[in-house]
Amino acid sequence: MDISYPVINAGGLKNIASQIIMEIELDKRENRPTDNVPPDDIGKIEVVDDAEMEQFYGSSTTDAYRLKSELVSQCMADIGMGRFQWKLFTVAGFGWIVDNFCSQGISAVQPPIQQEFSGIKQVSYSSVAYYVGMIIGASFWGISSDLIGRKPAFNSTLAIAGIFLCAAAGTSNFIAFSALWAVIGTAAGGNVVCDSMILLEFIPGSHQYLLTALSGWWNLGQLVVSLLAWVFLANFSCPTDATPDTCSRADNMGWRYTLITLGGLSLAFTFVRIFVFKMPETPRYLLSQGNDQAAVDAVNYVARQNGKPEPLTLSMLQAIDVRLGFTPNAEERLSTKDILKENMQEFRGEHYQALFATRKLSQHTALIWAVWLIIGIAYPLYFNFLPSYLATRFTQDSSLDLTYRNYCIQSAVGVVGPLSAAVLVNTFLGRRWMMGISSIVTGVFLFAYVGVKTPMSSLAFSCVTGLLANFANQLSEYAIMYAFTPESFPAPHRGTASGTAASLLRFGGLVASLIASETGFTTAPIYASAALWVGVGVLCFGLPFETHGHAAI
């Protein structure tokens, strides 16, 4: 929708905001029922005069959207963190679990796949197919969330992943296996992006740190994959020296059991999302589409679910338009189909242009995307190929059982990372410094890891490295993408920014897969990963905007 507003300087905007808020408070005191609610607490909304954010975002958002979004933020603060948001925190976590089911699942089943299927030049080519799918999925689901809303991705991606994980378990050749993983990648590429945006747009600003804690579900998913690999792959796989000539399907069912279990769990999560947990479209997306009434309904739905008074009315949002010189007309409400058609006609790169509206925002966008690309290469070079590296590192006195036991221990230790990160990103160091410090420390430990000489030393060092790298992963990969990135971009363009970042991450994963295809499971990928993590830390120090202390708009 092409709506023009008068150009207003910062001082005039502050005066307008103050006048609007005072009128809103008076209206609410006079008209809203006051049963069991102290008069001074009814609809108390304070002006948010965040000059730093206003300067940072510039013309990337309209004054009307910014004021309405700040009003919604204050309403969410009044509602507080309640039953609805904690349920959403759990249901959104399902997406993180399934994301790990896919990313770690393909890594876990590649060794037995190579033993059973004939004609495989490099088993990691299946990872190449998977990452191609993820690149497509991240772009599609991220950008579409700005065009048609957050809910379609929220409800669809888990179903796609679950169905095709089960289907992949039934394949009997490498080409079909890789093709199905490409489809799985289209779902895995976008689900976590939208899950993070949805949680961010429903929680009060005081609880935005939960976006970092949300990634603890990802580590839980890694632990599930590790346990399934230990149970199924260690006990229902061909011997480690088997070849396609000696490894039959009947003797190698472990990887199939693993994928069927992962797919079944994903479908169960899908059922809960669609049929058990009821969620409206996010109010920030609705505001960006000019659908003020639906945004009011969404905010008040959260209030009712939390047992709180409804804090928002349509007249409050309309007052902002009137004070800015825009009078809403009575045009008929566009359907979802019409909104999609109009958005596609008007898109023409406008969402991307808005991400470079100011000098600082341009620098921020470029660095965020660069960091994501580098992490996309660094992380899978070590962690996605860890089971195969462990299996080949100490072949003389190791076994599949020992390999996956170690993998489970490392995964369990990694769960600590997100919880610690959620606390530390809220300290005086903020997001940027914690990202930079933890990334550099991770790189140092990865450099040292390749020097261990015994299996027990390898396990101990892997646990420490796993803790730090998962910790850095929350403060770099996950805190940047799934906490810092959505926090730092405005909702009208949040999906485009996050989706593009995720696409670059997945492109980095594709590069990592190609590197592994050429180098094999040697120490070379670990050295490369270590150097890249150090580089990420340096770039994090150059980010121009800190989201700690600022409520997302």
Swiss-Prot record:
InterPro entries: MFS, MFS_dom, MFS_trans_sf
Keyword DNA-binding: no
GO molecular function (one): transmembrane transporter activity
TM spans (from-to): 89-109, 128-148, 152-172, 174-194, 213-233, 257-277, 366-386, 409-429, 433-453, 459-481, 496-516, 525-545
Reported induction: Expression is induced by nicotinate and 6-OH nicotinate, subject to nitrogen metabolite repression mediated by the GATA factor areA, and strictly regulated by the cluster-specific transcription regulator hnxR.
Glycosylation sites: 235
GO cellular component: membrane; plasma membrane
Keywords: Cell membrane, Glycoprotein, Membrane, Transmembrane, Transmembrane helix, Transport
Chain coiled-coil ranges: none
Stored PROSITE patterns: MFS (PS50850)
Primary location class: membrane
Subcellular location: Cell membrane
Membrane topology of this protein: Multi-pass membrane protein
Annotated function: Major facilitator-type transporter, part of the hnx cluster involved in the purine degradation. The nicotinate hydroxylase hnxS accepts nicotinate as a substrate and catalyzes the first step of nicotinate catabolism. The major facilitator-type transporters hxnP and hxnZ are probably involved in the uptake of nicotinate-derived metabolites, and the oxidoreductases hxnT and hxnY in the further metabolism of 6-OH nicotinic acid.
PANTHER family, alphabetized: MAJOR FACILITATOR-TYPE TRANSPORTER HXNZ-RELATED, SYNAPTIC VESICLE GLYCOPROTEIN 2
Similarity annotation: Belongs to the major facilitator superfamily.
Record-given protein name: Major facilitator-type transporter hxnZ
Organism of origin: Emericella nidulans (strain FGSC A4 / ATCC 38163 / CBS 112.46 / NRRL 194 / M139)
